């Protein structure tokens, strides 16, 4: 957050699968309301755990170079993510400032879903809460 506030020439790539998947599937700041994890077996409770953290909403009003979120739930979405990452890297090469690209990703193992059902969860739940697209593109033609 502080690097973004200072508009440091840093690229942050964030993979959001709504859980801490490498440590057993515990609730993360991005776990959705009602989503079950090993540390929240009844599901995330808004009153007790608070709302999921949306990094794009937190950073969208900062004076940064680029902010985008994509998804890997289809080949077309993967292509968009690649474009977002390329654009962020190009901005880094030009020294334009802080860039963040968040990638929505499935976690079939810790979600307890099949790979196909994980894609359905992504489309119906994850992408409904975490909107995809480009949110800040400083110095873009036509502005943003």
Role assignments for model-derived ranges:
Residues 1-21, 83-87:
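Thiamine diphosphate
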Residues 15-18, 72, 104-106:
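Short, ordered loop/turn segments at secondary-structure junctions
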């Amino acid at each position: 957050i502080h690097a973004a506030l200072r508009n440091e020439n840093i690229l942050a790539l964030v993979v959001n699968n709504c859980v801490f998947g490498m440590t057993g599937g515990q609730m993360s700041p991005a776990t959705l309301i009602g989503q079950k994890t090993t540390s929240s077996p009844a599901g995330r409770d808004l009153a007790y755990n608070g709302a999921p953290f949306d990094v794009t909403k937190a950073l969208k009003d900062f004076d940064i170079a680029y902010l985008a979120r994509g998804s890997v739930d289809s080949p077309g979405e993967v292509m968009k993510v690649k474009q977002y990452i390329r654009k962020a890297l190009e901005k880094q090469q030009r020294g334009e400032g802080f860039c963040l690209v968040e990638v929505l990703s499935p976690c079939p193992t810790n979600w307890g879903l099949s790979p196909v059902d994980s894609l359905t969860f992504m489309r119906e739940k994850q992408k409904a809460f975490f909107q995809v697209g480009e949110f800040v593109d400083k110095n873009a033609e036509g502005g943003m």
